């Protein structure tokens, strides 16, 4: 599959978001169950406070990246008043992974944030999720070893996922 930056555009159709979100987060390694209302709330939050970019092959959305303003109350990472943005989701449909879609979406979104005057971008990742950690490291995010967060998975629907896990924070100066 040849990755082309011109295939990235603003994702503004809930159905595109839902298809990718529901597929990615219901399967390995997440195994989460989300209602349509919860997915819509997540979509609306990212549309209201940020932006979602989709990677399209024709009319088909194969993946997306969403980011929104960082609020200090939401995550325990502090940028000392600097304008910062939270990359809340990077999701690619399983059969299109390892083709460079996420690797195209991340720098595209970071360039967009830089042009809006953001000084930092950050992600919150599972500490045992090598695919996410690899994407972050390839894009020069560094881990903040002073900050972590334990998360309980209230949406987990299979026992193959541990009930709690550690989320780590990685950031990048833009």
Predicted segments, located by residue:
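Active-site rim helix/loop that mediates acceptor-substrate recognition in acyltransferases
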Residues: 29-56, 64-66, 72-74
């Amino acid at each position: 599959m040849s990755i082309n930056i011109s295939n990235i555009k603003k994702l503004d159709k809930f159905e595109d978001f839902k298809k990718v979100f529901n597929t990615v987060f219901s399967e390995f390694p997440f195994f989460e169950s989300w209602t349509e209302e919860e997915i819509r709330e997540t979509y609306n939050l990212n549309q209201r406070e940020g932006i979602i970019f989709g990677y399209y092959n024709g009319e088909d959305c194969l993946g997306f990246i969403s980011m929104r303003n960082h609020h200090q109350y939401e995550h325990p990472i502090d940028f000392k008043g600097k304008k910062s943005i939270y990359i809340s989701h990077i999701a690619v449909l399983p059969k299109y992974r390892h083709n460079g879609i996420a690797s195209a979406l991340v720098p595209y979104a970071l360039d967009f944030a830089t042009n809006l005057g953001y000084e930092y971008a950050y992600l919150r990742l599972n500490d045992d999720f090598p695919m996410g950690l690899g994407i972050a490291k390839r894009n020069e995010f560094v881990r903040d070893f002073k900050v972590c967060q334990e998360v309980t998975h209230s949406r987990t629907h299979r026992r193959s996922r541990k009930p709690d896990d550690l989320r780590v924070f990685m950031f990048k100066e833009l």
